[in-house]
Amino acid sequence: IAELVQFANAHNSHVHVTVNMLPHESDLDGIEEYLKTLDSIGVHAIIVASPSIMMLAKKLGCKFEVHVSTQHSSTNSSAARFWKEKGMDRVVLARECQIKDIRSICEENILPIEVFIHGGMCISFSGRCVLSNHMTLRDANRGGCAQSCRWKYHLMDGETELSDPTNLFSMSSKDLQAVDYIEDFIHMGVASLKIEGRMKSAYYLATVVSSYRMLIDYIYEHGHADVEIIERVKKEIAKAENRPTGPGFYNGLPGYKVQLYQDHDETVTQEYVAIVQDYDKESQMATLQVKNHFMPNQDLEIFGPHIPSTIVHVVDVYDSDKNVLEVCNKPMQIVHTKWSGPIEIDAMIRKIR
């Protein structure tokens, strides 16, 4: 975490550490020392669900901000006012809030407000589910959720099976995707937009974060989001999604169309195959690290922090001994190829399905 804080400071970014478990008595030992350590290395904020940890951080005089976690299910301005009185610095609203409620809370201007815009949705109130506790003995409220709601079940009525044995019952919801609401959030004064990153790959995060960043920058430049940019961003995000998405609760109480009652395809439309490690402008040779199987002499798509998604035709690919490769299928292998399109260090390359 200390190394991450140094990196973030050098890139004008912040590090917020989740300390949002609901601690049982046996978990209390070491929390004070942990908070002091986080403070000493300069994290910018902690995200907390337990009032005991919130109060401890304030009592210790920690320099970082204390943000109320979404797991506290804050859904109204009275809750925000309560947390302000307790000295909290920001509230991450419950994912069960509707757009109209978020607007009303922001209009009160009580505390900076943070909302979720992308990622998994709990079938129960966020962070309040105990399915995982019962099914796997893993405590969902202490970082151990096994996502039991996404398992496939035989739905029984006594001895009679109601589910289709070839398409078993599930009880999870579609993931949240709030592209259509980003303009609203910006104009109503939401302080921070939150993307779920727990257990996600670097490729997923790079794709989703860069897509929303593109949309946010467009809105700040033009004052609004038109249909073209909305569809472009949705198309980009879909390249990393492996679950159906929907608006969550933002339109109101979700109906059956945002629930996933049966099996569904979880295949992404594009596959992350390499990352750029180096590039020689004079020879136009790119050095890549292989991540997944791909073939030379095909079209690939590159994207990075400073370059838009661009299709580039890749010709011959060589290993470190300058041998021509017929296939790139060794993860972490370093390969070289002539590159004719835009490129930058750490840009990601994906296969087009």
Outline where the language-model segments fall:
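Non-catalytic, usually N-terminal nucleic-acid engagement modules in DNA/RNA processing proteins
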Residues: 1
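Surface-exposed amphipathic alpha-helical tracts and adjacent flexible/coil segments at the periphery
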Residues: 4-21, 29, 35-39, 65, ...
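Alpha-helix capping/helix-boundary segments
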Residues: 52-53
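Conserved phosphotransfer cores of two-component systems
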Residues: 61
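Gly/Gly-Pro- and Ser/Thr-rich, intrinsically disordered tail segments characteristic of DNA damage-repair
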Residues: 66-77
